[in-house]
């Protein structure tokens, strides 16, 4: 039985495009205006810091000789396809899940673009307290984390709210 894309979660794919535009635009601006390693303080505890990142979160596989680029690219493609299928199978009215999936897909594709185009992921947000610095990250990473948090939140909502 065929169903209209607008009646499925794929209706929310526009959010993937928004995430990609914002993420890739921010990375473009960083690469055009900063040398890798440059840091500019924005606020207390927040810097812009242009960096090339070869691994995954918290330096996972960062020094593995290059093969991890393709490994993480495959993961990004696989997760994006899986979530797109889940969006297709869900109703457009299941907003929270579909927004979460779209944020994760947008973030995954933003970092995938970096890995394929540059050979590394461009990170620029440096949050710190005193001398302790959190791992530098980008807007794609933020979209992925917000999407994951929404999925967790959805799990705690009563079933009536899940259908909204």
Swiss-Prot record:
Pfam families according to UniProt: Peptidase_A8 (PF01252)
Main location: membrane
Keyword Cell membrane on entry: yes
Family listed: Belongs to the peptidase A8 family.
Protein name: Lipoprotein signal peptidase
A GO biological process held by the record: proteolysis
GO molecular function per UniProt: aspartic-type endopeptidase activity
Compartments where found: Cell inner membrane
First and last residue of the signal peptide: none
Role, per record: This protein specifically catalyzes the removal of signal peptides from prolipoproteins.
One Gene Ontology cellular component annotation held by this UniProt entry: plasma membrane
InterPro entries assigned to the protein according to its UniProt record, in alphabetical order: Peptidase_A8
